Amino acid sequence: MNIETKYHGTVQLSQLALVSFENGLPGFEHEKQFALLPIHDSPFTILQSIQHKDVAFVMIEPFSYFPTYEIELDDATCEQLKIQKENDVALYVILTVAEPFTNTTANLQAPVVINVHERIGKQVILTNTPYKTKHRLFPETVEAK
């Protein structure tokens, strides 16, 4: 299957690259099918709609940048995504890419949870959490005078 993408042009996909989001993503409820497109030699992955090329999100697995990040999924989410054990899950967070890149932030309050075996996912909005929608990827640095 070939699709047009925002960042990679035309891409040929295997079924293994596809992930279904039963309810879409918040704000993009009509987008149900996405492809996971890793950016080679980088920690970034693109979550690309297969229906609309301009609907694409830059994501990372959060643990390299936020080593203490942890979430607990409720039973309803685990049931919806058919999660039985921890290694069923891939966890990503969506980035807001900024210029300069050092100002890029990650949305830790709404991770994208994917069952890697069933190829189904959901963006989970966490409540009662210290996480916010904008956490800097790179700590602010103070320039020496």
Swiss-Prot record:
Write down what this protein is called: Flagellar assembly factor FliW
Organism equals Anoxybacillus flavithermus (strain DSM 21510 / WK1)
Q: Does the keyword Cell inner membrane apply?
A: no
Say which domain of life the source belongs to. Bacteria
Q: Which family does it belong to?
A: Belongs to the FliW family.
Keywords tagged on the record: Bacterial flagellum biogenesis, Chaperone, Cytoplasm, Translation regulation
The entry's cellular-component GO terms read: cytoplasm
The record's listing under Pfam families reads: FliW
Task: Summarize the protein's role.
Answer: Acts as an anti-CsrA protein, binds CsrA and prevents it from repressing translation of its target genes, one of which is flagellin. Binds to flagellin and participates in the assembly of the flagellum.
State where the protein is found: Cytoplasm
How does this protein assemble? Interacts with translational regulator CsrA and flagellin(s).
Family annotation (InterPro entries): Flagellar_assembly_factor_FliW, Flagellar_assmbl_FliW_dom_sf
- Does the keyword field hold Nucleus? no
Primary location recorded for the protein, binned into one broad class: cytoplasm
GO process terms (BP): bacterial-type flagellum assembly; regulation of translation
